[in-house]
């Protein structure tokens, strides 16, 4: 079976290599590779941290360091890093304690009303690892089919403010305006075939004890699939840096928890939802930090090279557009006319790429 990567253009191969270096810097790659080892030595950690300053690092680097401190108690970080690590742990705990009562309440209400549901993403990881101090911005819960609207009516009557999007509705605390729980009618993975996944998730879901109730979560393989697609989305949209870091540790846990993943399930999910190419991009990026995670040749034989090239173009244009639009300032445009023309060029491109997923197959 030929390796489909050789069917990519040189510029696409170069971009994937370049993108890996944009997503993870050199020290982050060293730390993540080290963190995936069963046991690490103090000398190995000190070597990886050489020249790195946690106070100047972004949220991704700090989150990686925090996870290492929790998963590898056999090593210790420099004393000047401990305040930052403690602050991260405190933030995780405070946020979780804010969300937990609503999390449990929503589960109990859905159970009492006989509505089907599955906990997704970070919320599901909290069910799998209730004592692990993981940052959880909000809880994502899948309530598919006709049960979706019934659930929204129930929570609206219970006083929650609703914030609707295409695939989900956020429940906000009316007192604080904070987002607490997202109710999904289907898993938001960026394709029109996403609805097909709901039935597959339900058929393999696990029921686990959680707090004072039980919760239904995707099996480890389905969790891995959703995580990989979300990783590609986060990379493309330049969002959730700490989520990208957490995802690496989530993947390792899920593989260890299952005692060995059934990769045919992950492939089946990708084919069902038409996200094979997105998984391939995630795999290529994550191989730099999780070299032994994926089986050899995973997903390669399912790749449509033409679709992959288009998706790489979409990823490239979206990232470039977001960077330019985010950093644009009128004062800068006055000083530099080329930045103004670049702004409008990418604004038009970004409109079409995001809304109609047109794949502009040209050099940036």
Can you say where each PLM-predicted feature lies in the sequence?
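Conserved NTP-donor binding/palm subdomain of two-metal-ion nucleotidyltransferases/polymerases, i.e.
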Residues: 2-137, 143-364
